């Protein structure tokens, strides 16, 4: 997986690819944090703590959106695909 590090010698990887790796790893971590907070919110019995955990989860969603936007701006193919699929009512799956 991408968060396990580089799969090619670091000297052979461009700065741009290394930055993209950082961004993809960060996006994965933010989405994982959202998942963990969702589970904590579901399991939590204390309503005050549940509200705090939900707030923290939503901040992770903001972080994920920021990183995804950085990726979109840096990668023309992601830009095209995200513009094609996000915020539309068109079919998502290829049928």
What name fits each language-model region?
Residues 1-95:
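Iron-associated oxidoreductase/ferritin-like identity signal
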């Amino acid at each position: 997986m991408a968060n396990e590090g580089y799969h090619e010698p670091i000297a052979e990887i461009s700065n741009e690819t290394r930055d993209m790796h950082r961004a993809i790893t960060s996006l994965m971590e933010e989405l994982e944090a959202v998942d963990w907070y969702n589970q904590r919110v579901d399991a939590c019995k204390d309503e005050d703590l549940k509200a705090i955990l939900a707030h923290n989860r939503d901040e992770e969603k903001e972080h994920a959106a920021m990183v995804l936007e950085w990726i979109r701006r840096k990668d023309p193919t992601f830009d095209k695909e995200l513009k094609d699929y996000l915020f539309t009512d068109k079919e998502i799956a290829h049928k």
